[in-house]
């Protein structure tokens, strides 16, 4: 069980490093706006949703995608809509002035936002199916249903750990950006997400 947890942790952490997806953009935005707790809860929500996808992929969810080519088409369409919507919101966003007070509601909303964005990003199913297929071929661990849970938990922890680390890095460097610089950065991220579609 421990090897499955550790492999999931490593795969989740390093698989989240590319800063190009919607969750990365949300975490970066919150970090630049000084909304660290909310960004942390976005990371936790996204980590949980993606960890569940990893668990399902480990359990054999890849068969659904392979057996039904329409799933891939629907996946691409849903991802395009999510990225386009986030891109538009970033283009229109105004950075928060100064430090913001974050209460329980902000944390809960951050968690739900992170979970929803990751859960409704069906390309993650395909990504984790591919990762699990490669892992299966590597024979690093045995593939038994009882190892799906520790693998999924490891992925969840690794993903959340990466985004928390990213948030801390952004938080430390945030003072170096002017309000206008943050606004420009958010618009560039929004444009990037729209063009990525």
Describe each model-derived feature in a short phrase:
Residues 112-130:
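Selected transmembrane alpha-helices and immediately adjacent juxtamembrane segments
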Residues 75, 79, 189-192, 196:
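Hydrophobic alpha-helical transmembrane segments of polytopic
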Residues 144-160:
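Short alpha-helical packing/oligomerization segments
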Residues 36-112, 169-173:
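Membrane helix-loop-helix hairpins that form the core translocation module of multi-pass transporters
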């Amino acid at each position: 069980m421990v090897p499955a947890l550790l492999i999931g942790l490593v795969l989740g952490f390093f698989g989240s490093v590319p800063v190009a997806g919607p969750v990365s953009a949300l975490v970066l935005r919150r970090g630049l706006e000084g909304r660290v707790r909310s960004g942390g809860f976005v990371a936790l929500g996204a980590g949980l949703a993606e960890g569940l996808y990893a668990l399902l992929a480990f359990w054999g969810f890849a068969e659904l995608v392979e057996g039904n080519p329409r799933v891939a088409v629907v996946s691409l369409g849903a991802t395009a809509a999510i990225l386009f919507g986030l891109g538009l919101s970033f283009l229109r966003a105004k950075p928060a002035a100064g430090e913001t007070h974050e209460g329980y509601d902000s944390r809960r909303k951050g968690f739900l936002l992170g979970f929803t964005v990751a859960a409704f990003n069906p390309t993650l199913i395909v990504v984790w199916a591919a990762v699990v297929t490669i892992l299966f071929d590597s024979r690093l661990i045995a593939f038994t249903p009882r190892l799906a849970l520790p693998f999924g938990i490891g992925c969840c922890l690794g993903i959340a750990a990466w985004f928390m680390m990213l948030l801390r890095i952004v938080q430390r460097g945030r003072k170096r950006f002017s309000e206008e610089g943050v606004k420009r950065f958010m618009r560039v991220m929004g444009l990037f997400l729209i063009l990525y579609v």
